[in-house]
A protein has these predicted regions:
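Vicinal oxygen chelate
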Residues: 80-143
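Core segments of cupin and vicinal oxygen chelate
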Residues: 1-4, 10-48
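Conserved short beta-strand elements that form part of the metal-binding/catalytic scaffold
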Residues: 30-63, 113-120
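N-terminal beta-strand motif that seeds the catalytic metal site of vicinal oxygen chelate
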Residues: 1-17, 62-67, 126-148
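Short coil/turn segments at secondary-structure boundaries
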Residues: 66-73, 94
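Short amphipathic alpha-helices within nucleic acid-binding modules
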Residues: 73-80
Length: 148
């Protein structure tokens, strides 16, 4: 039972389009999907469907942090361990969060919501596919034009 890596964060924002513009045009993330009041974005080097979720809300804040676990069975193993510590665990069905399989959510003692998941949709680069096998896509050369 182990955590593989930090997967994503979901931020609440009262200024959804301004936030999307900032993450896209200043920090270089790209939009992967929109659903309801949420926009899914990813950093160019991320292999997963999204790195960041921006969700429209009345107040800004952190909705949750997602951690990918090392194996499918780790999700339930962590659920049992967290419940044994007296914490409440909520099971999240596959597809509730775009690009992600079954997950659990809980509030850790510091007060923020955490999410653990294993199954995730991989980024599909299409025409942005890199020739390098260790890169999910070609680098986004923002502000530069390619010379022929």
């Amino acid at each position: 039972m182990r955590i593989a890596h930090l997967g994503h964060a979901e931020l609440r924002t009262p200024k959804l389009e301004d936030s999307v513009d900032f993450f896209k045009n200043v920090l270089g993330l790209e939009e992967t999907e929109r659903t309801g009041h949420s926009v899914y974005m990813r950093a160019w080097g991320d292999w997963e469907h999204h790195t960041l979720i921006l969700t429209e809300a009345d107040r800004p804040g952190l909705e949750h942090v997602g951690w990918r676990v090392g194996a499918p069975e780790d999700v339930e193993a962590f659920a049992k361990e967290i419940e044994a510590r007296g914490e409440t665990v909520t099971h999240v069905e596959a597809g509730t969060e775009k690009g992600q399989g079954d997950a659990i959510r809980f509030t850790y003692p510091g007060g923020q919501m955490m999410e653990l998941y294993y199954d995730v949709d991989k980024f599909q680069p299409g025409d942005k596919r890199s020739r390098l096998k260790n890169a999910p896509q070609k680098p986004p050369y923002r502000g530069l034009e390619r010379c022929s």
